[in-house]
Curated annotation (Swiss-Prot):
InterPro entries: Flag_FlgI (IPR001782)
Transmembrane feature ranges: none
GO molecular function: structural molecule activity
GO process annotations (BP): bacterial-type flagellum-dependent cell motility
Name of the protein described by the UniProt record: Flagellar P-ring protein
GO cellular component: bacterial-type flagellum basal body, distal rod, P ring; outer membrane-bounded periplasmic space
Length: 365
């Protein structure tokens, strides 16, 4: 119940933090200014016997790498590759990244390697969705996990030793074109779509620059006219994105995670009049085995019988009443007085939703 009170207190205080205005750059993004995902395949070498077991796929990759270095491995020789591991590499290419700049990469084992700790990623290409190479990755891995295994099969694993990271491990080789400097307009897309917030954003821009400069297209997008000159457009956008907007109040929602028992109730939730009674039913089944011994010299056999005892205990349900316009605070206070556990509160909320007593949306994760 302490956790339930904590969640309720946090939700009650949340609107106080949102009462002040937010910068446009904090609640929206510029259309076309986005990161791009890169992916690649490579080999990590230098592992202390924790690499890949011998298989045709890894062996072929290893032979291809040596061939690229001008080393021909005879077909009748099977290389030992316990210190090598095939890996998948992925990274995010930031917007406006230029050739020569570096980005972080994440390296993950894709075979049977036990750990990448102490390994070094050899030069690997990172490609975009179009199949073109945008960066080249190489470097020593930093692995936060640790794994150890004994000769008897016992092992200890801490965190994830098969995933590592290389800070500034990839060099950008190609710039991704974008449409930022094209056209007469810039479009801001709200992180959380809302018609009221979109209108307010357009009003703030129009108040500063002039009427009809900004127009809300829908609940997400706001179109703003901007200079064509790249230098002027950057200065213009720097001014616009630092303007402050009062975001609209969030829609009334109750979020329930049935797997973890977490319940978050928004402060905008209102309840219609309702009377609620919730009682618990406990069923206990006990199994006892009884042994029956035959009389001496009777020729009988020992018999084992099961004796089951079933006990049903029903807790006395208490009823509480919610008046018109009851708020989050009223609901939490009522369930705390009754002693409802978070698991039971989920059932109560679902029942209230079915009865039409919740003025808001119930979202079950």
């Amino acid at each position: 119940m302490k956790s339930l009170r904590l969640v309720a207190l946090f939700c009650c205080l949340l609107p106080l933090g949102m009462a002040h205005a937010s910068r446009i750059k904090d609640i929206s993004s510029v259309e076309g200014v986005r990161s791009n995902q890169l992916i690649g395949y490579g080999l990590v070498v230098g592992l202390p016997g924790t690499g890949e077991k011998s298989n045709a796929f890894t062996e072929q990759t290893f032979r291809t790498m040596l061939n690229n270095f001008g080393i021909k491995v005879p077909d009748n020789i099977k290389p030992k590759i316990k210190d090598v591991a095939p890996v998948a590499i992925h990274a995010d290419l930031p917007p406006f990244a230029k050739p020569g700049q570096t980005i972080d990469v994440t390296v993950s084992a894709i075979g049977e390697a036990k750990s990448l700790r102490g390994g070094t990623l050899l030069q690997s290409f990172l490609k975009g969705l179009d199949g073109r190479v945008y960066a080249v990755a190489q470097g020593s891995l930093v692995v936060g996990g640790l794994g150890a295994e004994g000769a008897d099969g016992s092992k200890v694993v801490i965190n994830t030793p098969t995933v590592g990271r290389i800070a500034n491990g990839a060099t950008v080789e190609r710039e991704v074109p974008n449409s930022f400097s094209q056209g007469d307009t810039i479009t801001f897309n709200l992180n959380r779509p809302d018609f009221t917030t979109a209108r307010r954003l357009a009003d703030v821009v129009n108040d500063l620059v002039g009427p009809n400069t900004a127009q809300a297209l829908d609940a997400t997008s706001v179109k703003v006219y901007a200079p064509r000159d790249p230098g002027q457009r950057v200065s213009y956008l720097a001014t616009i994105e630092n303007l402050e907007v009062d975001p609209a109040s969030e829609a009334a929602k109750i979020i329930v995670n049935s797997r973890t028992g977490t319940i978050v109730i928004g402060s905008q939730v209102r309840l219609k009049p309702a009377a609620i009674s919730h009682g618990g039913l406990t069923v206990t089944i006990a199994e006892n085995q009884q042994v029956s011994q035959p009389n001496p010299l009777s020729g009988g056999q020992t018999a084992v019988t099961n004796n089951s005892t079933i006990n049903v205990q029903q807790e006395q349900g208490r009823m509480f009443k919610l008046d018109t316009g009851a708020t989050l605070d009223d609901l939490v206070r009522a369930v705390n007085q009754v002693g409802v556990a978070p698991g039971d509160l989920m059932a109560i909320l679902e029942a209230l939703q079915q009865a039409g007593a919740i003025e808001g949306q119930l979202v079950i994760l």
